[in-house]
Amino acid sequence: MLRVAVPNKGSLSESAAEILSEAGYRRRTDSRDLTVLDPSNQVEFFFLRPKDIAIYVGSGELDLGITGRDLARDSGAPVAERLSLGFGRSTFRYAAPAGKDWKVEDLAGLRIATSYPNLVRDDLSARGIEASVIRLDGAVEISIQLGVADAIADVVGSGRTLRQHNLVAFGDTLCDSEGVLIERAGSPADDSARNQLVERVRGIVFAQQNLMLDYDCPKTILDDALKITPGLESPTLSPLADENWVAVRAMVPIKGHNGVMDELADLGAKAILASNIRSCRAL
C-alpha cells in the first residue's frame, strides 16, 4: 500500500487536500485525524507537520509527500521533486529595517533570524559571508524589534507583514517556493502505484492551469486562427453544416485566455466558448 504524507495544517493543507480529492482520493472528515486509509486506491495518507514531511519521505518510511519547496530544501533530507503543484507560491528573501539601501554583503557579522536556518547558511556560505544565524519557529519579523536579530530571512508573500514592521526585503530570492510533490531521492522509476498517483495529480494541476476553447471558424481564416490556438498537440477540427466553416477545439492556458478570445473574435471566429477542465491525462 502506498504511504503518502499530507500537510496537517497551514497554507498548504487545504490546497493539498483539494487536489488529492479532485484526483479521486479519499479526504479526511475530521481535522484531528492523523491517518486516512483509502482501500479502493490502496493508499494510506498521513497528516503531518509540513516541516517534517521531507524528513519522513527522505527516510523512506513514506513513499510520497506534499510540502513546500522551501521546507524540503531546508530539511536537508534526501528528497527529489516529482511535480510542482502550482499553489502556495512565495519567495524567500532577506529583510532588514527600512531606511537603508541594504545589500546582501551588509549581512556580514550581523545576526539573522529565520525559521529556515539551513537555507540561509547555504546561501551565506555560497556568497562567502560570515554571519550568525538564529533559528526561530515563527514570527521572525518581531525579532529585530526585540533586539534578538539585526536582519531576518523569511517567506515573503504580499509583503504586508514586512511593511507592518517597517522592514524592507533586499537581495536576490533565496528560493522561489510553491507546493511540491516529493519522493525519496533515487526512488525506483518503475513503481506503478507511485506513478499512478503522480499522474493523477499531474492531470489535476494541468486542468487547473488550462481550459478548453471551442469556436466556429471560417475556412478562409483557419490558418491564422490555428496560430492563435495551436493546442497541446494539434487542435481538433470538425465539419459544420456550412461547408465554408469548421468547428475548432483546442486547449489554451487559463492565464491570458480572454486575450486569445479577443484575437479570435477580431479575426472573425464566432461562438467562442471557454470551458473548465476537471481532470486530464495530457502530458
UniProtKB/Swiss-Prot annotation:
It catalyses: 1-(5-phospho-beta-D-ribosyl)-ATP + diphosphate = 5-phospho-alpha-D-ribose 1-diphosphate + ATP. Keywords: Amino-acid biosynthesis, ATP-binding, Cytoplasm, Glycosyltransferase, Histidine biosynthesis, Magnesium, Metal-binding, Nucleotide-binding, Transferase. Feedback inhibited by histidine. It is found in: Cytoplasm. Its cofactor is Mg(2+). Gene3D superfamilies: 3.30.70.120, Periplasmic binding protein-like II (3.40.190.10). Pathway: Amino-acid biosynthesis; L-histidine biosynthesis; L-histidine from 5-phospho-alpha-D-ribose 1-diphosphate: step 1/9. It is an enzyme of class 2 (transferase). GO terms for biological process: L-histidine biosynthetic process. HAMAP family: HisG_Long (MF_00079). Belongs to the ATP phosphoribosyltransferase family. Long subfamily. Catalyzes the condensation of ATP and 5-phosphoribose 1-diphosphate to form N'-(5'-phosphoribosyl)-ATP (PR-ATP). Has a crucial role in the pathway because the rate of histidine biosynthesis seems to be controlled primarily by regulation of HisG enzymatic activity. This is ATP phosphoribosyltransferase. It comes from Rhodococcus opacus (strain B4). The lineage of its organism: Bacteria, Bacillati, Actinomycetota, Actinomycetes, Mycobacteriales. The gene is hisG.
